[in-house]
């Protein structure tokens, strides 16, 4: 009933939910262990094929194309309100240069740092945030289909197996923390591996040695007041929705919490609030983001088919190159077709197994605001999620990427990323313990680092 109601709330846009018997489950996904299963539900929904950072940058790039001014690696040092509006003291953290900016309205959407920023600027609100830590582990591909598998863990919280190209992304956890700066612990890792091994019929159980990379972060959850009294609440019952407060006298807007899937609605709400504070906005034509019109898509795939784009690939892939370029870049993919026509090697992978071709790298260097190698590997692409630390470090293509992205600073940016500290942290993620006695290093074998 819950799945059907949720489907109806979405205007029945996708296929209707289906109730599955244990046999129906294993017919669709043989890897699922049905020994203790009473049944399951097949539900159609959207998921992010690349990663959340790439999804968000799609909005940033579209906003830039529509005339927005955007900057990254800028820190707000302080801001004061004067008779003519706000005066912000800012710092370019990469160049170490301070500068000043004026603004009629300030919007605090700093996620887990929202309360600290409000305190710093003297803003009083009815809401605040508490933080929930979540992690994901990337392992070799588990299920063959492009399906997200969802299970209840031993604490009755949902966790997922999400396809990510040649890998599977397992997670997430949901634990209260008091700081936004978190990392994957042995306990986090062991919990997820235990849960997934108990619910899948794998040839060999997953161990720390199978971990290719990890993700870790916090969710800012909105609460009333200062969050007092929530310590003993069911953590998963706290709302994932957002709250917005507007200080009309100071022309200051604060956004608490929220989910990525609701980002357009939150943006529209903020735009209306900005308008009520006296700023005149351009009329929303609802065409600056999202997929271009169907006729444009049809023309792109026609051109890709005529130039035999997908046959240029020398390696097997989990999606065709034409599909991937259109999904990631939309209108901007037409220029990539032209570049590949001129030089077919532009359709080659920059790093084997990364599913990221040379023409994307050239485009990223020109248009994707890449300042550090971490930007490129984790935020504009998913290379650092689907390939191990060692694979990336030893790949010839990483040096080509650094030269193209950073020019004279190529070696500097390479050295910033490949540090002993980073190698130690990713090696620790794969270290054995008593829970996994069959792990190679537990028996004295060698263990390569992964990231």
Describe these PLM feature segments.
Residues 76-79, 160-161, 244:
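A structural signal for short hydrophobic beta-strand segments in well-ordered beta-sheet cores
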Residues 42-105, 264:
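Helical element adjacent to the flavin cofactor pocket in flavoenzyme catalytic cores
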Residues 1-3, 8, 13-36, 41, ...:
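C-terminal accessory subdomains/tails of enzymes that are appended
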Residues 73-78, 131, 210-212, 285-287:
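Beta-strand segments within the central parallel beta-sheet cores of soluble alpha/beta enzyme folds
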Residues 74, 167-168:
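Core alpha/beta catalytic barrel or barrel-like domain that forms the active/cofactor pocket
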Residues 81-85, 90-162:
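Flavin-dependent oxidoreductases
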Residues 18, 69, 99, 130, ...:
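Residues that recognize and position ribonucleotide moieties
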């Amino acid at each position: 009933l819950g799945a059907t109601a949720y489907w109806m709330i979405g205007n029945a846009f996708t296929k209707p939910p289906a109730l599955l018997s244990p046999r129906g489950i294993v017919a669709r996904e043989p890897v699922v262990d049905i020994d203790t299963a009473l049944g399951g539900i097949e539900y159609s929904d959207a998921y992010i094929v690349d990663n959340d950072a790439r999804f968000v940058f799609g909005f940033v790039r579209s906003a830039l194309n529509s005339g927005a001014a955007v900057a990254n690696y800028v820190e707000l040092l302080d801001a004061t309100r004067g008779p003519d509006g706000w005066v912000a003291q800012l710092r370019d953290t990469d160049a170490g240069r301070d500068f000043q900016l004026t603004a009629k309205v300030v919007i605090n959407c700093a996620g887990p740092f929202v309360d600290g920023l409000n305190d710093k600027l003297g803003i009083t609100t009815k809401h605040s945030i508490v933080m929930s830590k979540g992690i994901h582990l990337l392992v070799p591909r588990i299920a063959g289909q492009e399906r997200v598998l969802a299970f209840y863990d031993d604490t009755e919280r949902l966790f997922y197996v999400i396809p990510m190209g040649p890998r599977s992304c397992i997670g997430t956890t949901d634990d209260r923390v008091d700081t936004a700066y978190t990392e994957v612990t042995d306990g986090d890792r062991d919990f997820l591996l235990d849960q997934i091994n108990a619910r899948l019929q794998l040839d060999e159980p997953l161990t720390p040695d199978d971990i290719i990379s990890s993700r870790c972060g916090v969710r800012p959850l909105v609460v009333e007041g200062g969050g007092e009294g929530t310590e003993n609440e069911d953590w998963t019952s706290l709302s994932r929705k957002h709250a917005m407060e507007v200080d009309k006298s100071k022309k200051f807007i604060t956004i608490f919490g929220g989910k990525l899937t609701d980002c357009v609605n939150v943006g529209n709400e903020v735009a209306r609030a900005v308008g009520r504070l006296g700023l005149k906005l351009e009329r929303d034509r609802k065409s600056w983001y999202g997929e271009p019109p169907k006729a444009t898509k049809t023309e792109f795939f026609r051109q890709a088919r005529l130039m035999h784009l997908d046959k240029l690939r020398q390696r097997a892939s989990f999606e065709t190159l034409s599909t991937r370029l259109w999904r990631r870049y939309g209108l901007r993919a037409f220029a990539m077709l032209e570049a590949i026509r001129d030089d077919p090697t532009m359709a080659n992978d920059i790093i084997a197994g990364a599913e990221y071709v040379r023409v994307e790298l050239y485009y990223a260097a020109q248009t994707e605001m890449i300042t550090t190698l971490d930007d490129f590997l984790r935020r504009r692409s998913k290379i650092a999620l689907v390939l191990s630390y060692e694979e990336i470090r030893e790949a010839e293509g990483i040096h080509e990427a650094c030269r193209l992205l950073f020019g004279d600073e190529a070696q500097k940016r390479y050295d910033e990323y490949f540090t002993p500290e980073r190698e130690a942290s990713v090696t620790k993620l794969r270290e054995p313990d008593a829970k996994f006695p069959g792990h190679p290093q537990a028996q004295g074998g060698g263990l390569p680092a992964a990231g």
